[in-house]
Amino acid sequence: MTDFNNAARSWDSNSIHAQRSEAIARNLLERVQIQPEMNALEFGAGTGILSFMLADRFSSITMMDSASEMVAVMQEKVDGSSSKKLKPLLFDLTKETYDVEKFDCILSQMALHHVANTEVIISRFFGILRKEGFLAIADLDAEDGSFHGAGFDGHNGFDVVELEKIMRKAGFRSVQTEICFHMTKMTPEGPKDYPIFLMIATN
């Protein structure tokens, strides 16, 4: 399993992370009309790559992560930038509810498959989303476990049909999914392609 605190300092040096975020941001902007007064939350924001790419589109983005070193890197990047819209936040939404504010948009990329209870976290997303807001989740399509390999205790991607059912059960009305990126990773059997979907749900 990935130790995100140890990975934080070298995270941005892997170009695939930026390439993936660019593809997700592009697909999102093609499918959703974002208004400049909207605020957003990025769940499992890591070092904030996606939020930095989308900062100019929102009034503010709260970058939430439960790994303290990831949040430290985020803060350093914010301090070194001219952006006043990005707000790093150390918080674990899998363990407690967040009642400080509500959001017009919730973003998450490659974080959901690390969360043990998918239904609980989707319900918490719904609870902090404003009416007419949207949830955008980018994650792995269902795979055979080779993406993370032996010892990983999260989800081996998601069957999008089943995930859409969880969304609707939580209260989301419209749910649409597209493949937005492909990652290639080396496995013991050689290079393998892993599709990444972007699911957008509105309440």
Protein language model regions, located:
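Short alpha-helix
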Residues: N156-S174
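Class I SAM-dependent methyltransferase SAM/SAH-binding core
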Residues: L41-E96
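A short acidic, Gly/Pro-enriched loop at the edge of an enzyme's catalytic core
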Residues: T94-I106
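Core SAM-dependent methyltransferase catalytic element
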Residues: M183-N203
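Conserved class I S-adenosyl-L-methionine
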Residues: M1-Q35, L50, V73, G80, F134-E162
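A short SAM/SAH-binding and catalytic strip from SAM-dependent methyltransferases
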Residues: D104-N117
